[in-house]
Amino acid sequence: MAVWIQAQQLQGEALHQMQALYGQHFPIEVRHYLSQWIESQAWDSVDLDNPQENIKATQLLEGLVQELQKKAEHQVGEDGFLLKIKLGHYATQLQNTYDRCPMELVRCIRHILYNEQRLVREANNGSSPAGSLADAMSQKHLQINQTFEELRLVTQDTENELKKLQQTQEYFIIQYQESLRIQAQFGPLAQLSPQERLSRETALQQKQVSLEAWLQREAQTLQQYRVELAEKHQKTLQLLRKQQTIILDDELIQWKRRQQLAGNGGPPEGSLDVLQSWCEKLAEIIWQNRQQIRRAEHLCQQLPIPGPVEEMLAEVNATITDIISALVTSTFIIEKQPPQVLKTQTKFAATVRLLVGGKLNVHMNPPQVKATIISEQQAKSLLKNENTRNDYSGEILNNCCVMEYHQATGTLSAHFRNMSLKRIKRSDRRGAESVTEEKFTILFESQFSVGGNELVFQVKTLSLPVVVIVHGSQDNNATATVLWDNAFAEPGRVPFAVPDKVLWPQLCEALNMKFKAEVQSNRGLTKENLVFLAQKLFNNSSSHLEDYSGLSVSWSQFNRENLPGRNYTFWQWFDGVMEVLKKHLKPHWNDGAILGFVNKQQAHDLLINKPDGTFLLRFSDSEIGGITIAWKFDSQERMFWNLMPFTTRDFSIRSLADRLGDLNYLIYVFPDRPKDEVYSKYYTPVPCESATAKAVDGYVKPQIKQVVPEFVNASADAGGGSATYMDQAPSPAVCPQAHYNMYPQNPDSVLDTDGDFDLEDTMDVARRVEELLGRPMDSQWIPHAQS
């Protein structure tokens, strides 16, 4: 069902919130009459931080105006005449408003659609059974909104009390002036006759005594009113503090944690709109109470009455200032984090936002934000309020930006679009720490004036830790540092402390999150996959995941120490798996065609009872980012065969599907799926022209085909036909016959001692020969060849 149809069914507060989304910036009538067109446009496809996307935004604006004009032209009749005029007026109004800033229209409509969907979703959840988590969130949000209503009522109550106090005090002052006037009348009585003077004095004295008694009583009443008002403000501030703690220390911190986990591939942190609405309500109520307290102080100064009120007001004034200071400084946040692996001389972006900028009128004097890079130690000193002025660890180009207020969405933000780290100054490293373990952070700082320069706040916020690299080869290890930090950072930590050890299940969760995000797949790591990884990491043979649940993994085990017998770390191997899947094998992983996380012996155990020609794909132990084919073919020499691993470089030449298609003795994908049924949709179409056909320029077109020379004789039997070596080799016109004799005559020279055809262990030798020759090896010498 269309969102607009559901939005029209909202009731109560939800309907009020929906109506508040519209106004001069975007009339609700436009939403109503163009609802279908608006919801069919790709508003989310426009990158608001990319100036080049301005063309898309302009096209959307033009489309909107044209649709409005078209709608207006189709109106007929008496009622249609008025609507025609109104829609035409809206078309002109929107054109004039957004002609020079079409991105703002996109931002506005995205904001409206997001909030409509949220309100509809919340309304639907409220009327139908929902998950316990959703219910808990709804209950929490309901409690927050109820507290805001309570705060609104008590603030209105203190406003009424303040007005009553002011009126009482004004009347008291009038009566006090009257007593002074009476006192002044005693002087002229000396000029009257004794009898008349006595009469007048008696009357004035009676009046004076009565008035002074009244003034004395009223002074006590005033003092009581003042104390009661101050006590009410104290209670209001207690409730405000509690509400602010829930919003800033719970909800906002949770959002920041989600943002941190999103850096590891977790779900998006979500919109800030709800948080901003809460922070704005806080700001509004805090400011109202602050103004009330200041007015109460003014009344006390206007009419001093000895008592405890002055001290009480000074206390609540200091408290309210602390509250507003905490609100402003805590709501200056990084909406879009800079890259956490930051390469020098490379453009990067970030966005900072002040969640209370609109309500406190900060945008009336747009502040400038400055970004600098500081070290972990400098970040610690900053949080201790130590003097770190001009103490930076590098130079960032284009590091200043003025905050802009977006009227349609009510957001105050600064978009750093073209920053670049020109240079970095590294600190002395500790022990075995490498440059890719050194953490920095981007410091954003500004100065905000609140209430017409009445209050001035110096605000600062730190980005998530970043690792600075100077070459792409460092990316792998830098990503490991970021992954560990994002996954295991504890709330309120000293920058940027993380546990040196974590439990294996914790690491499993982080690895699975990263894996699904990198491979862009819903098929995550299974229990069996995690057992394999645990066996690899702990050098253990147990096949029960529960046996590893109590074991700890240290950072050194994760990405500092090499795995036993290997020249790479656990993370480097795992990252290589993600890399090859992401770049070349994603559809096959999603199809379940890659088993992947099994070792050689496990592969043989799985294949032993399968028919000949059954194969599986597993990740290589000897080659980072390598994947190998293991298959069963029972011959006189051996039963199991393992092909030398393919890597990203191989798949950039010929795809996995085509390579498997070339090997016709591979028949079934483990456990029993016909190969062509799984892979045929990924085969590259074969050209219709014959291999000997000549192009216009006279050249013969070659073909690349996967060949396993040592398995040529077996292929005919496995394929069930009369396949010959020539079936798998190029045409003689492309590759001379004499060239074939260069293959080794004794296939056992590349076999394991146990007779298993495993060429993983020959790779280092092959690459060494390649280095000695100073040129790539001929494909004939590589156990699997593109011929």
UniProtKB/Swiss-Prot annotation:
PTMs per UniProt: Tyrosine phosphorylated in response to signaling via activated KIT, resulting in translocation to the nucleus. Tyrosine phosphorylated in response to signaling via activated FLT3; wild-type FLT3 results in much weaker phosphorylation than constitutively activated mutant FLT3. Alternatively, can be phosphorylated by JAK2. Phosphorylation at Tyr-699 by PTK6 or HCK leads to an increase of its transcriptional activity.
Identification of the protein by name: Signal transducer and activator of transcription 5B
Pfam families: SH2, STAT_alpha, STAT_bind, STAT_int, STAT_linker
Single GO BP term: development of secondary male sexual characteristics
Phosphotyrosine found at: Y90, Y682, Y699
Disease: Growth hormone insensitivity syndrome with immune dysregulation 1, autosomal recessive: An autosomal recessive form of growth hormone insensitivity syndrome, a congenital disease characterized by short stature, growth hormone deficiency in the presence of normal to elevated circulating concentrations of growth hormone, resistance to exogeneous growth hormone therapy, and recurrent infections. Most, but not all, patients have features of immune dysregulation.
Annotated keywords: Activator, Cytoplasm, Disease variant, DNA-binding, Dwarfism, Nucleus, Phosphoprotein, SH2 domain, Transcription, Transcription regulation
Post-translational modification Phosphoserine, affected residues: S128, S193
Subcellular location: Cytoplasm; Nucleus
Quaternary structure and partners: Upon activation, forms homodimers. Forms also heterodimers with related family members. Binds NR3C1. Interacts with NCOA1. Interacts with NMI. Interacts with SOCS7. Interacts (via SH2 domain) with INSR. Interacts with CPEB3; this inhibits STAT5B-mediated transcriptional activation.
Function: Carries out a dual function: signal transduction and activation of transcription. Mediates cellular responses to the cytokine KITLG/SCF and other growth factors. Binds to the GAS element and activates PRL-induced transcription. Positively regulates hematopoietic/erythroid differentiation.
GO molecular function: chromatin binding; DNA-binding transcription activator activity, RNA polymerase II-specific; DNA-binding transcription factor activity; DNA-binding transcription factor activity, RNA polymerase II-specific; identical protein binding; nuclear glucocorticoid receptor binding; protein dimerization activity; protein homodimerization activity
Keyword Transcription regulation: yes
Cysteines paired by S-S bonds: none
Record organism: Homo sapiens
Effect of F646S: In GHISID1; transcriptionally inactive
Family affiliation: Belongs to the transcription factor STAT family.
Mutagenesis / variant outcome for changing Y699F: Abolishes phosphorylation by HCK
Gene Ontology CC entries for this record: chromatin; cytoplasm; cytosol; nucleoplasm; nucleus; RNA polymerase II transcription regulator complex
Domain SH2: 589-686
InterPro entries: p53-like_TF_DNA-bd_sf, SH2, SH2_dom_sf, STAT, STAT5_CCD, STAT5a/5b_DBD, STAT5b_SH2, STAT_linker
